[in-house]
From Swiss-Prot:
<dbReference type="InterPro" id="IPR029068">
    <property type="entry name" value="Glyas_Bleomycin-R_OHBP_Dase"/>
</dbReference>
<dbReference type="GO" id="GO:0016765">
    <property type="term" value="F:transferase activity, transferring alkyl or aryl (other than methyl) groups"/>
</dbReference>
<dbReference type="InterPro" id="IPR037523">
    <property type="entry name" value="VOC"/>
</dbReference>
<feature type="active site" description="Proton donor/acceptor">
    <location>
        <position position="115"/>
    </location>
</feature>
<dbReference type="InterPro" id="IPR004360">
    <property type="entry name" value="Glyas_Fos-R_dOase_dom"/>
</dbReference>
<dbReference type="GO" id="GO:0005737">
    <property type="term" value="C:cytoplasm"/>
</dbReference>
<comment type="function">
    <text>Metallothiol transferase which confers resistance to fosfomycin by catalyzing the addition of a thiol cofactor to fosfomycin. L-cysteine is probably the physiological thiol donor.</text>
</comment>
<dbReference type="GO" id="GO:0000287">
    <property type="term" value="F:magnesium ion binding"/>
</dbReference>
<dbReference type="InterPro" id="IPR051332">
    <property type="entry name" value="Fosfomycin_Res_Enzymes"/>
</dbReference>
<comment type="subunit">
    <text>Homodimer.</text>
</comment>
<dbReference type="Pfam" id="PF00903">
    <property type="entry name" value="Glyoxalase"/>
</dbReference>
<keyword id="KW-0479">Metal-binding</keyword>
<dbReference type="InterPro" id="IPR022858">
    <property type="entry name" value="Metallothiol_Trafse_FosB"/>
</dbReference>
<feature type="binding site">
    <location>
        <position position="115"/>
    </location>
    <ligand>
        <name>Mg(2+)</name>
    </ligand>
</feature>
<comment type="similarity">
    <text>Belongs to the fosfomycin resistance protein family. FosB subfamily.</text>
</comment>
<feature type="binding site">
    <location>
        <position position="66"/>
    </location>
    <ligand>
        <name>Mg(2+)</name>
    </ligand>
</feature>
<keyword id="KW-0046">Antibiotic resistance</keyword>
């Protein structure tokens, strides 16, 4: 049985530059570092960085693939200003309905996309149920969220 996400690993082109970004900009707690690897705790998640200098990185900008972290709505402007003040590449977000809450999309030095989001999964489902009748919705409850009902 899958219990949870164990860790996320990103390939980076410059480990020192990436360590500074994750530690100083995202305020991740660094656990270990070497000349090619770094481990952090970020939002309760084990995040690993591995330096791989000689791989192409051009296609990453075309993908919507990203990792999102929850922030409080009251901290939204503060986070936006912090990223902007630190010259982080902030991306133009998609047009949103207010029921879908707020998001800031940005990239790390290698172009990996991140989102800081003020909503929850339930917020998104409630909004989609109201506005997207073409979607099929399935029932789920708190037990389903943790897979406790599976053997």
């Amino acid at each position: 049985m899958i219990q949870s996400i164990n860790h996320v690993t990103y390939s980076v082109s410059d480990i020192s530059k990436s360590i500074n970004f994750y530690k100083d900009i995202l305020k991740a707690k660094i656990l270990v570092e070497s000349d090619k690897t770094a481990y952090f705790i970020l939002g309760g998640l084990w995040l690993a960085l591995n330096e791989e200098k000689d791989i192409p990185r051009n296609e990453i900008r075309y993908s919507y693939t990203h990792m999102a972290f929850t922030i409080e709505e009251s901290e939204f402007e503060e986070w936006y200003q912090w990223l902007n003040d630190n010259n982080v590449n902030i991306l133009e977000g998609r047009t949103r309905d207010v029921r879908d809450k707020k998001s800031i999309y940005f990239t790390d030095p290698d172009g990996h996309k991140f989102e800081l989001h003020t909503g929850t999964l339930q917020d998104r489902l409630d909004y989609y149920k109201e506005e997207k009748p073409h979607m099929k919705f399935y029932e789920w409850d708190e037990v389903d969220k943790t897979d406790n009902n599976r053997e």
